[in-house]
C-alpha cells in the first residue's frame, strides 16, 4: 500500500493498534491488488510461504494481528468483536471489498497459489487432503472448511493441491485457480 503502518498488523494504517479489533474501522488501506481488482484487471497471489502469512496477506487482508491466520489462534474476545481471520478474508475478499466500498463490483482474485492449507481446513481428519502428512491437517476450530466455501463461491474454478492437479487445469475453461500445495510453507 505504501502507507505507514505498525509492526504486527496487516492492511491497516498506523492508527490501528495490534490486537484491538475496534481500531480496524476507518484505518484500512488500499492495496495494489484491490486497486487492480477495482480497475477490472485480473488479479493473483503466488507465494512459497503460507498464503495467509503476513507478506502475501498484506495484499488482501485487514487484520490487527498478523498471526490471526485462523480462528484457533485468535482470542475469543477478538472473534466476539467481529474480527475475521486472515484465511477467511482471502475466501471472502470479493464480498469484503464490495462491502467496504459500496457501488463497486469486482470479480474476486483469479489466482491464489501457495502453502498454508491448515489455515483453511477444519480440525477434523475427515477434511484431510489426499496428501496430508499430519493425522489432522486442519487447524480451524470453527468447523468451517474454507476450501469448500471457495468452491461454492467459484464453481467454474479449480482447487489443486499438487503438480498433477495444477497440470490438469484447463485455462480455457477455469475462471479461478486456488492452490494450496502444503499444510504450511512450501519447502
Outline where the language-model segments fall.
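Surface-exposed loop and adjacent secondary-structure segments within mature catalytic domains
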Residues: 1-187
Amino acid at each position: 500500500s505504501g502507507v505507514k503502518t505498525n509492526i504486527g498488523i496487516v492492511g491497516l494504517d498506523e492508527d490501528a493498534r495490534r490486537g484491538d479489533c475496534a481500531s480496524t474501522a476507518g484505518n484500512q488501506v488500499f492495496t495494489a491488488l484491490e486497486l487492480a481488482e477495482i480497475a477490472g484487471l485480473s488479479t493473483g497471489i503466488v507465494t512459497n510461504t503460507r498464503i495467509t502469512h503476513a507478506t502475501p496477506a498484506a495484499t488482501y487482508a485487514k487484520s490487527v494481528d498478523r498471526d490471526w491466520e485462523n480462528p484457533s489462534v485468535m482470542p475469543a474476545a477478538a472473534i466476539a468483536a467481529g474480527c475475521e481471520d486472515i484465511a477467511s478474508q482471502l475466501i471472502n475478499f470479493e464480498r469484503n471489498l464490495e462491502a467496504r466500498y459500496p457501488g463497486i463490483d469486482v470479480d474476486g482474485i483469479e489466482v491464489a497459489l501457495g502453502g498454508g492449507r491448515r489455515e483453511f481446513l477444519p480440525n477434523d481428519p475427515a477434511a484431510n487432503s489426499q496428501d496430508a502428512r499430519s493425522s489432522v491437517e486442519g487447524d480451524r476450530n470453527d468447523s468451517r472448511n474454507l476450501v469448500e466455501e471457495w468452491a461454492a463461491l467459484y464453481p467454474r474454478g479449480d482447487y489443486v493441491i499438487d503438480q498433477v492437479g495444477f497440470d490438469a487445469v484447463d485455462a480455457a475453461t477455469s475462471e479461478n485457480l486456488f492452490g494450496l500445495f502444503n499444510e504450511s510453507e512450501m519447502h
